[in-house]
Amino acid sequence: EVYREYIYTGSPYISAMHLEGIEQNTVLIDSVSKRYSECGIRVGALITKNAEIRKAVMKFCQARLSPPLIGQIVAEASLDAPEEYYRDVYDEYVERRKCLIDGLNRIPGVYSPIPMGAFYTVAKLPIDDSDKFCRWCLEEFEYEGETVMMAPASGFYTTPGAGRNQVRMAYVLKKDDLNRALIVLAKALEAYPGRVEDEGL
């Protein structure tokens, strides 16, 4: 439930921990790095009413001993973030989301739904293989000395073949940088040798 502050539907956040009848099957995981935009801080929480899961997790915790000290210090300081921090970050993500989604959907052959939460989207591209495309962008493509880095969406699915023409893109950059990335992405799609026609999607 690490994205609970970033729900864009206007609906209230309801924790899975409050759903009746599934108590023994519910595991809540929280992360300081997601909630407070502190990339790399490996501090969080795992909460469950299932004693068997708690016992198994405790073994991993005892083997690890403790998270890095700096991460703990940063995490503790983050807990004191004022409420306006969340409002400001939320408002900024709403603007960045609009910038990225509108820009993606203007590129021929690209489609991105409007995410209802978090700070990333999964966009469908007119390409043969997202793993190949993402690697090609990093290793073989540049436009005016720049390229784009995306995550192949296939790694986020368990169904074989799912996400083969999708990429995950975060809108954590400033809007000017997102707009520039959209220009570079459009140029990459024009040049990519594995581009496919829309009907092949």
Regions found by a protein language model. Name each.
Residues 1-201:
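PLP-dependent class I/II
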